[in-house]
Every structure is written in structure tokens, then in C-alpha cells.
Regions:
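General small-molecule cofactor/ligand-binding pocket signal
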Residues: 56, 83-85, 189, 220
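Conserved short loop/turn motifs at secondary-structure junctions
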Residues: 4-8, 56-61, 86-92, 161-166, ...
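Well-ordered alpha-helical segments embedded in enzymatic catalytic cores
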Residues: 15-19, 67, 142-146
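Short, surface-exposed basic-aromatic patches at helix termini and helix-loop junctions that form
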Residues: 25, 47-50, 73-77, 175-182
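A conserved structural/catalytic subdomain of Rossmann-like adenosyl-cofactor enzymes
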Residues: 97, 101-315
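S-adenosyl-L-methionine
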Residues: 67-97
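Short amphipathic alpha-helices and their capping/turn segments at secondary-structure boundaries
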Residues: 26-32, 86-103
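Class I S-adenosyl-L-methionine
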Residues: 1-58, 64
Length: 315
């Protein structure tokens, strides 16, 4: 269990969808990187679905680091091709000069929020954060910047995020940079918070690519169709929509950059997909119910008249 994200490590359908989306465009990927290995469950799941030979990752927690290695080997990874290092990927990146075909992760809040002023200064200089037109604040974006740095130009990246980073006002500048200037964000997928053990707040998976030719962003709202469980059919529906970029009423939508700009780069899925269901009224059923109620009311009135006469209460 990831105590920070609340995601069950045994939630294989969720893990399966996450990994499936991250490799959808990289069926012949050679390398994969996870900056927050956290038990290795995402990595082992993706290795079962795709023949990726080189596995890279970091784990800040020393105890988990040893478990990560063991779990990967038990699940069939080649020990000689496993490159997992212990350390904080933000302040002590072990693979800074490497680039990977697939980069995927959940965001551990402790890595972000434990940064002191020295760490922030180091990170700002190392990653040239000023090009993103922002100062570091309490935000998930340093982690995302790190992941993008490690991604190949033709690679694909998937990251799980909380909803608030999609609309926070103080993060609008970096969203604008990643969307409009860099054109990295490809897809936003909203999922139900009931997939998480310790939260009912919805969350999203963001898909990034560096070699995009279009500035459109694809939105999928899977928060209502799939509640606290994802079946293989659910995953297939999401993956098919993602691969085809097909617009489906109340489920998926392709938004242009002008529309996103008009929304101040707010990425909340409900801004783009209307899932409101109007109540339908069966007039025949309503009329039938009215007849039944009128009949019942008539019987009650007859009873009242009877007792009023019996008790001689009429004027």
C-alpha cells in the first residue's frame, strides 16, 4: 500500500490500465523508468504486458528499495537489467543524463513537500526551472518536470495526479507552458476516487508526449462508468478511446487549444465533458399513478363522510 497516495498495491486492474496506457504508443519500448518505484508494482505489471528489457527507477525509502528489487526479480525481471537506486529523485537524481522510452509514476507527496530552500535552489538550477516561467511552490510539478526531463523525445509518460493541480490558480503559468509552449500534454483521464483505499476524491492520469504535432488535448471521464472496480472491459473501453481519440457522448472529448486557453488552462474534465443526465418523465406512468391516487382519495373521502354522519357532526 502506498500510504501517500492511498492506492492499493494489489489493485491490479487499476495498475493494468495505468501501464497499458503508458505503453499504448510504445509497443517496442526498450527502457522504462519509474522515479517512485514504491514496491515495483507498476513496473512488474507493465513488464508482464510488454517486453521491455531495461528497467530503471529510484526509491527514496531504504526499506522499500530492497523490497523493490526482490519484487521485480520474483516477477521475472532480469536482475542484470534492473537499475534501481536508492535516493530522492528530485534532490539526488541517479539517472539525470539518461532518457527513457516509457516514464510512469504516482506522485509521492513527501518527496515534493520535504524540499527545503537549499533543495529548491538545487532543483531550480539543475532543471532550468525558469524556462517554465514559475517559482517552486507547494506543487507536484517539480516531480513532473523531473519525469519530462528523463523522457525521450519520442517517448510516452503517464503520471497519476490529484485533481487540485489541474485547476489551481497559482499553477496556471506552468500549465500554460506545458500545454501551449511545450505542447507536451496529450490526454487527461478522470477516474473515480473509490479506486483508492483511503480517499473518495477523484484523481486523474495525465499522458505526456514530446513529439506531438497537434495542440489538441483528449479528455476521458471514466469516473462514473467505472466506480470502485475496473474490469478488463472497462480498461479496454478507456484504452480504445485513448488510442483512437474518438469523441463519445458524456465519455470523451477532444478539446482545441483555443478552448483550453479560454478556460485559463483549467484541465478539470467537467469543463469539457458534460455528464449531466436529465431526469426523464414517463407521462403514462404519471397519469396512471394519478388515477390510482384519485381513487384512493375518493375512498378516504367516503369514509370521512360516513363517520361525520354517524357522529352527527354535519351542520
Amino acid at each position: 500500500m502506498d500510504k501517500l497516495s492511498g492506492i492499493s498495491s494489489s489493485s491490479l486492474p487499476y495498475k493494468g490500465m495505468f501501464s497499458l496506457l503508458s505503453i499504448a504508443d510504445k509497443k517496442h519500448a526498450d527502457s522504462i523508468y519509474n522515479p517512485h518505484v514504491n514496491g515495483g508494482f507498476l513496473l512488474t505489471n507493465i513488464l508482464q504486458k510488454c517486453n521491455i528489457s531495461k528497467v530503471y527507477g529510484q526509491e527514496a525509502n531504504l526499506g522499500k528499495y530492497k523490497f523493490d528489487l526482490m519484487n521485480l526479480v520474483i516477477n521475472g525481471a532480469d536482475f542484470k537489467e534492473i537499475h534501481i537506486d536508492q535516493g530522492n529523485c528530485i534532490t539526488s537524481p541517479k539517472f539525470f543524463n539518461e532518457r527513457f522510452d516509457v516514464v510512469l509514476s504516482e506522485i509521492p507527496s513527501s518527496i515534493i513537500y520535504d524540499m527545503n530552500s537549499k533543495d529548491r535552489s538545487f532543483f531550480t538550477k539543475l532543471y532550468d526551472v525558469e524556462k517554465f516561467k514559475r517559482n517552486l511552490r507547494r506543487s507536484e510539478f517539480p516531480f513532473i518536470i523531473h519525469m519530462l526531463h528523463q523522457l525521450k523525445d519520442d517517448g510516452v509518460m503517464a503520471v497519476l495526479v490529484r485533481q487540485n493541480m489541474l485547476f489551481r490558480t497559482f499553477d496556471e503559468d506552468i500549465r500554460e507552458c506545458l500545454i501551449n509552449e511545450k505542447n507536451y500534454l496529450d490526454t487527461v483521464i478522470l477516474l473515480s476516487g473509490k479506486l483508492l483505499r483511503h480517499s473518495f476524491d477523484n484523481f486523474s492520469i495525465l499522458i505526456f508526449k514530446k513529439n506531438r504535432s497537434s495542440k489538441d488535448i483528449f479528455f476521458i471521464d471514466a469516473s462514473k462508468d467505472f466506480d470502485d472496480k475496473l474490469t478488463d472491459e472497462n480498461i479496454e473501453k478507456i484504452a480504445d478511446a485513448y488510442a483512437s481519440k474518438k469523441v463519445i457522448d458524456k465519455f470523451s472529448y477532444l478539446a482545441g487549444i483555443d478552448e483550453i486557453r479560454e478556460n485559463d488552462y483549467n484541465l478539470t474534465v467537467s469543463r469539457y465533458i458534460d455528464t449531466f443526465e436529465e431526469d426523464t418523465v414517463d407521462l403514462n406512468e404519471v397519469l396512471s399513478k394519478k388515477v390510482r391516487l384519485d381513487k384512493k382519495l375518493g375512498g378516504i373521502n367516503e369514509d370521512i363522510d360516513y363517520w361525520l354522519n354517524e357522529l352527527d357532526l354535519y351542520d
